[in-house]
Structure formats: structure tokens, C-alpha cells
Amino acid sequence: LAEKTMDDLRELGKALRWHPAFPKGANVNFCDIAASDRIVELTYERGVEDFTYACGTGTGSTVLALTLMGKVSGEDVAVAVPGGELRVTIDRDNGSIRNIWLTGPTNIVCEGEVRDEDLHI
């Protein structure tokens, strides 16, 4: 992340988000590994079409992938995101992933209403 500008990352995020391999689109997570228990992460989120403060599923998936690759410990990994710091622990049992624990602050960033007729169900 330190070697790329935000504009470069935004363009790459947009290109990957719309890549034909992902017909419904995808969130794109970028990360730098600072230590075995600390990473820095940015999420380019579909629908928002820009970076967001945080993405819990993206953060959990990123730490899980890095843990399985042996890049981070998977135990109380601190993840610095634009919205603050999240912590992730990968719970394993005999080589199987049992749980992904995500903790961190929460904030209401908007409120809205969805009418029944807008749901199309």
C-alpha cells in the first residue's frame, strides 16, 4: 500500500471489482503486512464503488487467507482500517477452521428506510 497512491489503488480496485471473472462484482481488499500480528487493510467495496471505512467480511477473509499462507499468526491480529482498528482471531481445531472472531468499534454512519415495494420479493 505504501508504494501506491490512493488513485492507483482505486483504479486497480475498480478494475478487479468489475473483472469478468466476477459477474456479480466483488469487494477488493488490499493489505500490507506490518508484523505477524498486524496488517493495514483497505477495502474497495462494490455498490459503494470506492474505499470504505471497514468491511468485516473482507477483513476476516483477508486475515484467514494470510493465516493459511503462514503470513500472520491468526491470533489476535490487529487490522488497521480507515475507520479504526479491528482485531481478528482464527479459531482452529485439528486443522479445520471453526470460527473467525472479529472485534472492533462500531458506529452508525447512516440510517434509512426500505419500503416493501422496493424489495421486489
Q: Which residues does each PLM region occupy?
A:
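An anionic, turn-rich surface loop/hairpin at beta-sheet edges
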Residues: T57-G58
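Active-site proximal loop and beta-alpha junction motif in alpha/beta enzyme cores
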Residues: L1-A54, V63-I121
